[in-house]
Amino acid sequence: MKQPALDPDVADVAPNDSVLTTYDEEHLVTYWRLLDAEADGAEWKEVARIVLHIDPDREPARARHAFDTHLARAKWMADHGYRDLLRGGAIK
């Protein structure tokens, strides 16, 4: 696995696979930032703007959906996906 980007742009929808994906590897920092923001009680619109690079005032539905799916994926990574990382990463 190569080092993930520190502030990558995101897709409109996070993966929903039952295994770690290349996208997940590329967005590890994004996932950790989302989990940190949730733990800190940050407002979702601020997180969408800063972490996901989507303006929730201009694109509210897109921003909310991207936020929800990426946060769900971040939680999946913390609970399950990390095991795939320990085994060597995404299946190529």
Residue ranges and their predicted role:
Residues 76-92:
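Intrinsically disordered, low-complexity basic tails/linkers immediately adjacent to helix-turn-helix/homeobox/MYB/SANT
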Residues 24-40:
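Short, amphipathic alpha-helical "recognition" segments used to contact nucleic acids or chromatin
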Residues 40-50:
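Short, charged amphipathic recognition helices of the HTH superfamily
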Residues 1-18, 91:
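Basic, low-complexity segments
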Residues 14-16, 70, 85, 89:
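Bacterial C-terminal helix-turn-helix
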Residues 33-34, 57-80:
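Major-groove recognition helix of helix-turn-helix-like DNA-binding domains
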Residues 13, 50-62:
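Short helix/strand-capping connector loops at secondary-structure junctions
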